[in-house]
């Protein structure tokens, strides 16, 4: 290792090194240690594995063409206070609207432009953990790479925030493109909530159990826009 004040041949600048009685650790190494801490959380990694499994289903069934669809999962209850307080890779990315019911919450979110087949293979290379700020007005990217979340993050967070504010414990928002449902929406009669709901209930009896309040229909809006978020 070269002396302090000059970068070594691995690109680590030792001007940022601090001394510990037993260790010499660079800022780069600290980030790696944070990742090790998270990877050692068995409950967290089991949930990440389930996300990968679901992403695989979306891909194999053709319900997420190209980079279509996205996933966000609230992981807050699976993390220790130490893990929730890990330093950010990217800090204070502003949100258009304060998410007051999500302050301090941590989510796994698939990345912008990422494909489900790749999420299934490596969730952390195709998504990131984000932490909502204490005031709910911004978020940090925590791990494992500074991958920007899906462009539809505002819609996801608005749904999470709404449900949380209502005392609901729903932790997952999954946006997908089921082929048959999309086909039905191209037929004008099914653009009526009651019509499509009753049709689905009659075709699949279990649907009434899983979706007891029916299926909502919202007008078309450009994905990721404020209008899209509000309509959802």
Which residues does each PLM region occupy?
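Residue-identity detector for glycine
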Residues: 3-5, 11
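Serine residues within intrinsically disordered or low-complexity segments
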Residues: 6, 26-29
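Intrinsically disordered, low-complexity segments enriched in serine/proline and basic residues
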Residues: 19, 29-33
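Hydrophobic alpha-helical signal peptides and transmembrane signal-/tail-anchor segments
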Residues: 21-25
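Glycine-rich flexible loops
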Residues: 33-231
């Amino acid at each position: 290792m070269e002396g302090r004040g000059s970068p070594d041949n691995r690109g680590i600048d030792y001007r940022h090194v601090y001394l510990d009685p037993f260790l010499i650790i660079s800022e780069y190494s600290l980030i790696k240690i944070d990742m090790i801490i998270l990877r050692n959380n068995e409950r967290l990694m089991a949930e990440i594995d389930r996300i990968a499994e679901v992403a695989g289903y979306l891909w194999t069934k053709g319900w997420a063409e190209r980079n279509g669809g996205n996933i966000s999962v609230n992981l807050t209850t699976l993390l220790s206070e130490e893990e929730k307080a890990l330093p950010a890779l990217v800090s204070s990315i502003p949100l258009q609207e304060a998410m007051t019911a999500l302050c301090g919450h941590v989510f796994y979110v698939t990345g912008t432009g990422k494909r489900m087949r790749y999420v299934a293979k490596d969730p952390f290379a195709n998504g990131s953990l984000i932490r909502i700020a204490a005031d709910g007005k911004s978020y940090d990217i925590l791990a494992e790479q500074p991958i920007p979340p899906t462009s539809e993050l505002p819609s996801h967070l608005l749904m999470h925030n709404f449900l949380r504010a209502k005392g609901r414990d729903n932790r997952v928002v999954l946006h997908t493109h089921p082929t048959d449902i999309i086909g039905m929406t191209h037929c004008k009669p099914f653009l009526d909530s009651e019509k499509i709901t009753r049709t689905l209930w009659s075709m699949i009896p279990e649907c009434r159990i899983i979706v007891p309040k029916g299926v909502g229909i919202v007008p078309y809006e450009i994905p990721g826009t404020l209008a899209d978020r509000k309509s959802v």
